[in-house]
Amino acid sequence: MALFYLLAIAAALLDRVTKLLAIHYLRDGAQSIVIIPDWLKLTYAENLGIAFSVRFLPPTGLLFLTLAISAGVVWYVHKSNNRSPLFLTAFGLILGGGIGNLIDRVMLGHVVDFIYFDLYHGALFGIPLDLWPIFNVADSCITIGACMIVLFHEKIFTRKHA
């Protein structure tokens, strides 16, 4: 169980530190920082929605939804008897990412995003399109945790019979 909380705290702290750096160095109209030309750059963005900046609830609603999901993850992990490292890692990453974005919503009223894979920027049928959204460390943790659950679901959720 310690692994679950340790990963959640580490993910939330890493997310917070990177967002503070993004706020300090990228906000206020600063130029993007190119990491890999034509591929990866750091660009400041304020996200009032959820993934892909989708807005389906007002900011207060998203705050409470994030809080409810985070509480649900903690409840589920505690209720489950599963203590496999994969299970605890996946859900620890999801919780840490949720807490990281929750901190932003409480403190700022939006989520700070700054990682941008510039895979395609143009138009599709005349509609402006960026192939990949700007995201953050918390989003990455949530995505990695969810992918672990999908990819390793048999190992994570199959009970061993004695």
Curated annotation (Swiss-Prot):
Source species of the chain: Chlorobaculum tepidum (strain ATCC 49652 / DSM 12025 / NBRC 103806 / TLS) (Chlorobium tepidum)
EC number, UniProt record: 3.4.23.36
Any one biological process term the GO annotation gives: proteolysis
The name this protein goes by in its record: Lipoprotein signal peptidase
Gene Ontology MF terms in the entry: aspartic-type endopeptidase activity
Membrane-topology descriptor: Multi-pass membrane protein
Transmembrane segments: 56-76, 84-104, 132-152
Protein family membership: Belongs to the peptidase A8 family.
Keywords: Aspartyl protease, Cell inner membrane, Cell membrane, Hydrolase, Membrane, Protease, Transmembrane, Transmembrane helix
